[in-house]
Amino acid sequence: MSFQGTSSGSSHSSKSKLNQVVQNFFSKATQVVVQARLNPRLREQRQSGDKHKLNKWFNLETDELEAYREDLKLWRTIDIYNMDKMPPVVVETYLDMRHLSPNQTLVLEDAFGKRWNASFGGRKTEVVLERWVIEIQRPDPQAGGATTSPASSTELPMAYKKCILLFRSLYTYCRLLPAWTLQKRLSKSKLSTSPLRIGCRVLNGSQPISSRGRVGLSKLIAGSSESQHLQTFSFDPVEIPSGVFKISVSYRVNCNFAVDDSEAMLSSQFLRIDEEKPVVPPSPPVKHPSMAAPNLHYITGLPRRHSHSQGVGVSGAAIVPTSVSSVTDYMERRRSSGASGVGATGGGLAGTSGGSGGVSGGVSGGSGGSGGSGGWGGEEGSPGPAATSASPSTPPFARVPSSSSLAALRIPRRTISNSSTSSTNNARVVTTPGYTPSAYEQAISSSGGSSRSGSVPKYSSSFGTRQWNRSGSISSTRRRNSMLVGSAESAMSSGSSLMEPGSGFIDIEDPTDVSDFVKMVDSIKPGSPYSLPSPRKGSDPLARFQQLKGSHAGIADSITSSIYHHQPSPPYVRSKLSGEANLEAISSLPRPVTVPPSPRKLETQMQPISLADQHTSEYHQLQQRTSARPQAHSYSERDQLDNSHYKALERYDLVGASPSVVGSRYYTEHDRGRGEKRYSVAPLPGLEFDEDDDLLFAMSDMAMGDSASGGNVRT
């Protein structure tokens, strides 16, 4: 009996010790977590009314908080042998937002420095930071596990020692989590109390946990992924005779909460919305063949399809609108429309004996079948030789690579703009169906389309739109002629180029004098000295005019002396030599003789050929106006002066002399029959000018006289 009583007493003490270990296990674990999260000042206030007690279980001294004693009443009075399943203890750590003012907002700053609203418009009052779960898992008898048996004297002490290691790990790990950092940051604000507070709540794990009015642990606040904002950690379990001790925690990784102004938070949200808008990547540039093709054609000479969407000119070129004032605008319109420049009907209008199958036929004048049908306006007929001989990779009537378009770009805009209007007016009527060109238009098309399209004139009236090579003029002409007749590719290139001279786009008419000048220059060899045909054979113009110098000086002196000697009556002097004989009264006082104007200024005022008729009419008008004036001198003096002047003037060759001398002679001859004394000649403005001007002016007069009379000069 004594043995049975001893064994029953030992088993009862073993059960009581096991129950104490289990009860203190739940209470000690809860106290360690709560004391690590609560503010020390708040913890002191809660302990102020109670006697300070220390909890030394599991070799860890902690404060005994009586505030959570009622919450842990179930687990403090538990009997492990009488309960089949023990509920777990859940300790939640949360952030309390109830003390925030209306103009304050809880924000969460992420790792990139962005702030996110965590109050959700004031509808939430708490944010769950951590959730601790403390439990004992007992073996299930239905699953074949061992039933609860009294702990032996050797098993319980070993389990207690393992629990000491577990609580030390729990105490350390609680101070490594983000919630501990938040609690230390909030407790450092000594000057002002933060409206944010961290609280803990003890819950029964066997009952459902509601998240109404608070932000749950699984709720995503920041703009990070769900797998990053929440993590879970479990401690190593400790086995006891009646089951297994387990502690686990789930916590938020980012607990960088702060209080911010509501208006500032609102503006930051707007900025964040703008930053989070998906940026549409720029679409790759769309290449338009119609815009890129013309540049390649002019640079590399690639094949280019022709179109008959625009009219065809008389010489085979496309009609240029009259409103286009520059080549650049015209080419831009050509690129936008995608049309080329040459039509198939240019061959028939260029003076050929039939329809042309291609551009080569239209330019060189070869006869062929009807116009080609591929890309040439849809005319019926078989394609010409140029179309049939093209390679399969090259489109019909493709442009042959050449440098004609590059050279055409160098043509000044003024030449093209001036000639484009006339070329357009002549070529516009050709596009009308059933129109029969007139003889004048056929002549223009025959000369401009067939001849000028192949051979480029070397000179023009402006002398600024063509390049002139004196040494290679004959060879270049032969080379162009051979390219025009013998090479179909050169004919196609010259006929299809819109900018090339002679294509109809530029209408050039060479004057006769320019062509004569070109012939004269071509006849001179590069090494030969420049010489002009002499006005008279065997005479030197320089020596001739040097001999006239003394006679001119003598005539000037005689006229000047006659004016000084005969001054009693006011003379009447002609104001101009251009045909108007206005008489002006001059003072009777003697005045010095002024220097006459230069002959170069008198060139535009008097023409020697028509002075006879003009002076005849002037003489009669002067005779009628001055018939009533008194005679101051005798007729003998007047006749003597006129005879001396006339004899002096007859000694000179007046054909090559200055126009002023010729005018003086005509005036003197018509004045000889007058019966009164009149000083009709002022100092002759051709006798006292510079010798160099006289020489140059006389040479030009001689050249004009020789060309008119064929070299027969009157002496």
Swiss-Prot record:
Complex formation: Interacts with ATG1 to form the ATG1-ATG13 kinase complex.
Name of the protein in its database record: Autophagy-related protein 13
GO biological process: one example: protein transport
Matches recorded under InterPro entries: ATG13 (IPR040182), Atg13_N (IPR018731), HORMA_dom_sf (IPR036570)
A Pfam family assignment: ATG13
Top-level taxon in the UniProt lineage: Eukaryota
Claim: ATP-binding is one of the keywords in the record: no
Classification lineage: Eukaryota, Fungi, Dikarya, Ascomycota, Saccharomycotina
An example Gene Ontology molecular-function term: protein kinase regulator activity
